[in-house]
Regions:
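Structural transition elements
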Residues: 327-366, 386-388
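Gly/Pro-rich hinge or "lid" segments in bacterial periplasmic/extracellular proteins
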Residues: 75-79, 174-228, 232, 240-242, ...
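Surface-exposed binding/hinge segments that line
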Residues: 104, 138-185
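Acidic-aromatic pocket-rim loops
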Residues: 57, 273, 331-332, 338-339, ...
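Long beta-strand-rich cores associated with HINT superfamily self-processing modules
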Residues: 507-535
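Extracellular/periplasmic solute-recognition and catalytic clefts
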Residues: 26, 149-151, 206-217, 234-295, ...
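N-terminal lobe/hinge region of extracytoplasmic solute-binding protein
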Residues: 44-96, 127, 196-199
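Extracytoplasmic/peripheral linker and loop segments enriched in polar/acidic and small residues
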Residues: 99, 356, 405-416, 443-511, ...
Length: 535
């Protein structure tokens, strides 16, 4: 079985597909004949971004703050997810051998400072993503490492030449993290996007008041005529779940676009009745148990495997799904998606046995062999109620049952990420934050630290790197699936890090909020260009 249908569409027919995406944008804008223009959308953001640069981030807080100010080359059509459509791209062609991607840009696009967008800006942005200069972090460096050269034959044409095939490269060009920066800004200061915003998106930056809110106003020069509908928006930081729920219930905010727990959903429905809209979906997001293998005793695979084997994921799923956004047991691929490991195979992997008594006996044996019968350590965690706090409490209890004593420490998002990124943690609750199910994205987090800054276990494993590289080149589905299984087996046997549980997304919005679209990823739809208020 070959991956042919999709790439046939993306090859010689890709230009037509690109134009269809363009037409879809405008038909969507004009089909809503009853749209009410104007007004300011107030919405909640449950964490504050550590900086403004999506290239260097893997937390939704950055996108929910900065997303409305930026555009990307392509994006996902949320009504037909995971189909891609043009954002800055007017059309595109993909060579049959998948080694050349040619994009034609929409004309008359301007950055918020009045500078005209050209192919040079696309090149500068993707050069920064694939080969960041010293002092700049690109968490997608591994993803775009297959780009050999970027050509700009004219101001509205950009050509990507590949070193090797990546069967999912077109979808990566639609990543919401790949916002386009101005070449002149990057030339003046490659690190400037961390603290300054100059995009081409539907809203222009007004202010960011730390601890309070971020505000944007309508971009009157937006290249998509008739959009956005709103006069502006205010993203209000509500770091405590109770405060966020009170704000939704009281009408101070129209919703929160990440997700809430089942109990929080039930509270809002009971209090607000038919005034609240509830949308639910499986989620391309999982929590991870992550060991820093540079710290003793976590440099010993026996200790790491023992701690994973002590966790009753199946029982935990049943309990945690009632009180948090955690739900599904799964491996490196989202449960239910095409490349997910079937349950019958998953239970054979370390940490996924349904016989928890036997598994914990083996865990105690491994700890004894490693001389760690009285192990004590600190679990580093994020101070978000959903679902980090219940996950941390759950893990502390699980490890207690094999004689391990754990101190549970939580901090806000900025400090949490800085602590892990600098390698100061012993064990942490990390996350895999995906915008699609494709494994070229999902597995990249687990590559060697030298290739992937997102790898907070700090492991370097050439065997995993080779399996990853082989799988992204493979166009035969069954062969690719086998490589994914081998990658997963190696990762879990070495126990560098492992999925705890996958999430379930529940979003609550006021019914007066229109045009917002649900998806399996809270990283998508952050531009807010099609949102309007029926009030």
């Amino acid at each position: 079985m070959k991956i042919t249908r999709r790439h046939a569409l993306q090859g010689t027919g890709a230009t037509a597909l690109g134009l269809a995406g363009l037409n879809f944008d405008f038909s969507r804008a004009t089909a809503q004949t009853n749209v009410k223009r104007g007004g300011t959308l107030n919405f909640a953001i449950s964490a504050e971004a550590p900086h403004y640069d999506p290239h260097a981030s893997d937390t939704y807080a950055t996108l929910h703050l900065a997303g409305p100010f930026y555009s990307t080359l392509l994006r996902f059509n949320l009504e037909k997810f995971p189909q891609v459509e043009g954002d800055l791209a007017q059309s595109w062609q993909v060579a049959p051998d998948l080694m050349t991607y040619t994009f034609k840009l929409k004309p008359d696009v301007k950055f918020h400072d009045g500078t005209a967008l050209t192919s040079a800006d696309i090149k500068a942005t993707y050069d920064r993503l694939r080969n960041p200069p010293q002092g700049v972090v690109s968490t997608r460096k591994a993803t775009f490492g297959d780009i050999a050269e970027i050509q700009t034959p004219d101001p509205l044409t950009v050509v990507f030449k590949m070193k090797a095939v990546n069967a999912s490269m077109l979808e990566h060009f639609a990543s919401p993290w790949n916002v386009i920066y101005a070449a002149k800004d990057l030339s003046a200061d490659p690190a400037s996007p961390r603290t300054k915003i100059n995009g081409t998106g539907p809203y222009t930056f007004v202010e960011h008041v730390k601890g309070s809110h971020v505000a944007g106003k309508k971009n009157d020069g937006y290249f998509k005529k008739g959009l956005p509908y709103l006069d502006g928006f205010k993203g209000i930081f509500t770091l405590q779940a109770a405060a966020m729920l009170n704000a939704v219930q009281g009408g101070q905010v129209m919703g929160e676009f990440r997700g809430i727990s089942p109990a929080e959903r039930d509270r809002l429905v009971q209090a607000m009745g038919d005034k609240i809209r509830i949308q639910e979906s499986s989620w391309t997001l999982a929590l991870l148990v992550c060991f820093n293998i540079e710290k003793k005793p976590f440099d010993d695979v026996r200790v790491r495997r023992a701690l994973l084997m002590a966790i009753d994921r199946w029982g935990g799923s049943n309990g945690l799904s009632k009180i948090s956004t955690l739900r599904s047991v799964g491996g490196v691929v989202r449960p239910g998606s095409p490349f997910a490991t079937p349950e019958a195979e998953l239970v054979k992997l370390p940490g996924f046995s349904k016989d928890i008594k036997k598994s914990r006996e083996e865990a105690k044996k491994l700890l004894k062999e490693a001389g760690q019968e009285n192990l004590k350590f600190t679990l580093w965690n994020r101070n978000l109620a959903m679902p980090y706090t219940p996950a941390g409490i759950f893990l502390v209890d699980q490890w207690r049952q094999v004689g391990v004593e754990v101190e549970h420490k939580q901090s806000d998002t900025g400090a949490y990420l800085a602590h892990m990124n600098s390698g100061n943690h012993d064990v942490a609750i990390d996350f895999t934050n995906l915008f699609m199910d494709d494994t070229s994205l999902g597995l990249s987090k687990f590559l060697s630290l030298s290739r992937s800054p997102e790898n907070r276990s700090r492991s370097n494993d050439p065997q995993l790197d080779k399996l990853y590289d082989d799988h992204i080149r493979e166009r035969d589905v069954e062969k690719r699936k086998a490589l994914i299984r081998a990658f997963e087996k190696r990762l879990f046997e070495q126990a560098y890090q492992q999925q705890l549980l996958w999430w379930h997304r529940i979003v609550a919005t006021h019914k007066t909020l229109m045009g917002w679209q649900m998806s399996p990823s809270h990283n998508l739809g952050a531009q807010l260009e099609g949102v309007w208020l029926n009030a």
